[in-house]
Design a protein with these regions (language model features):
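Long, contiguous internal "core" modules enriched in hydrophobic/ aromatic residues
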Residues: 2-6, 12, 16-25, 78-80, ...
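Juxtamembrane/interface segments at transmembrane-helix termini
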Residues: 31-41, 73-85, 107-114, 255-259, ...
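Alpha-helical transmembrane segments of multi-pass membrane proteins
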Residues: 18-38, 101-107, 173-183, 374
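Membrane helical hairpin/interfacial module
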Residues: 47-111, 128, 132
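N-terminal regions that are enriched for targeting/export leaders
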Residues: 1-52
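TerminUS-proximal long segments
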Residues: 11, 314-390
Length: 390
């Protein structure tokens, strides 16, 4: 089936060429970083996780979001998701590849990543994170390819694949739960020291992943004969809406706990993220615009996905709502959550983080690599659908 990815119109090749250009530029930037060291990034002693790890955190959620198609289809026999389940599995593959790439570029010596396997430490969350991420990637590769191959041959999927499909569901939950535990297990960081980090991560994941799938389904409908179906899209939007509202509720709970308890350490990070902190005549507020964007775009997205006209009768506004939801959650978890957790540091000092141009280009390149992989996988899936259904 791989040969199907080698056939496409000029726009398909222009798109891949566009992504490939940024991938090449990012590769050059990474070689510079590899030779010079992480001193080329904006990270420091006080901010040891920067743009790379914040993107990793967000993309783990995007990967986990695909389970919101797998679970209803395979467990609850919701047949409307039959045509788009493969989109969720392929999105998980591309997202997990990006996750692993962000971990690699965050390491000064990438070869040291093998130490996690060569010298396993089960008491460390990093060990379990490596285990579930690679396990979930393997499961999606196996299930997605076997099921698509069966569909291509117009035969039922082999029965032996279904246990792997069912196993992938708890794996999807675990990848973001373990990632959350990496943060909430650090007692020196009050912003992350919360029992609802894992539920909050899952809520945002179940909004972000399906949002991107809806956008992809709408685009595929316009550029090919692939149609996910109105019922499937509407049900996904319902899932997105409930998940986004749950995530917003959890954010409000964080504010209530911090400000009602009036514990300075709990308030500090939220003050920095949403209002800025002034200390010794200097105002630190470089993340405030991003968090304002998170709130404003999130409210607009929820409104667009709630109003019947924009949700069911106008695909442009439906797609716009999903795009805004995806960006809003990226601003929250892909920017604010990780970077805001380092302010203030355990010594009550403030060190702001500014990514370098080299760091930004590597980040863009990894995202482009993910979309490159996703484009090829979706191309194969769509061609299989077109060959079968015409």
């Amino acid at each position: 089936m791989l040969e199907k990815a080698l056939r496409g119109n000029k726009y398909y090749w222009m798109w891949l060429g566009f992504l490939g250009t940024f991938m090449a530029i990012g590769a050059i930037c990474y070689v510079r970083q590899y030779n010079y060291g992480l001193g080329m990034t904006g990270m420091s002693r006080d901010v040891s996780w920067g743009l790379y790890i914040s993107q990793f955190t967000y993309l783990v959620g995007v990967a986990a979001g695909g389970v919101m198609l797998v679970l209803p289809y395979y467990i609850h026999n919701y047949k409307e998701f039959g045509r788009i389940t493969i989109l969720g599995e392929f999105l998980a593959i591309a997202s997990l590849v990006m996750c692993l790439m962000f971990i690699i570029v965050d390491l000064g010596q990438p070869i040291r990543a093998f130490n996690v396997m060569l010298h396993p430490t089960p008491h460390s969350m990093l060990f379990w994170d490596m285990l579930v991420l690679n396990g979930y990637l393997f499961l999606n590769l196996l299930c997605g390819w076997v099921i698509l191959t069966a569909e291509h041959k117009e035969v039922p999927p082999p029965k032996w694949i279904y246990p792997f499909v069912y196993i992938s569901i708890p794996f999807a939950i675990s990848i973001h739960t373990v990632t959350a535990m990496l943060y909430c297990g650090l007692p020196g960081r009050h912003f992350w020291l919360s029992a609802i980090i894992a539920p909050r991560f899952l809520a945002s994941a179940f909004a972000a992943g399906p949002s991107l799938i809806v956008v992809a389904a709408l685009i595929l409908k316009r550029i090919s004969k692939f149609d996910a179906g109105k019922k499937a899209i509407d049900k996904m939007v319902t899932i997105i809406l409930y998940a986004a509202l749950t995530n917003a509720f959890f954010v409000c709970l964080e504010f209530f706990v911090a400000y009602y308890s009036n514990v300075p350490a709990h308030k500090a990070a939220l003050n920095y993220l949403f209002f800025g902190i002034t200390e010794h005549g200097v105002t630190y507020n470089n993340l405030v615009p991003f968090m304002y964007g998170f709130v404003i775009l999130g409210v607009i997205a929820i409104a667009l996905l709630s109003i019947p006209y924009t949700r069911k009768k106008n695909e442009f506004f439906l797609g716009l709502g999903c795009v805004l939801m995806f960006i809003s959650l990226w601003l929250d978890k892909g920017v604010g959550f990780v970077l805001g957790g380092f302010v203030p540091n355990p010594l009550e000092q403030i060190t702001e983080y500014y990514p370098t141009a080299n760091e930004i280009m590597i980040t863009i390149a990894v995202w482009c690599t993910g979309f490159f992989i996703l484009s090829i996988l979706y191309k194969i899936a769509v061609k299989v659908e077109e060959d079968i259904h015409g």
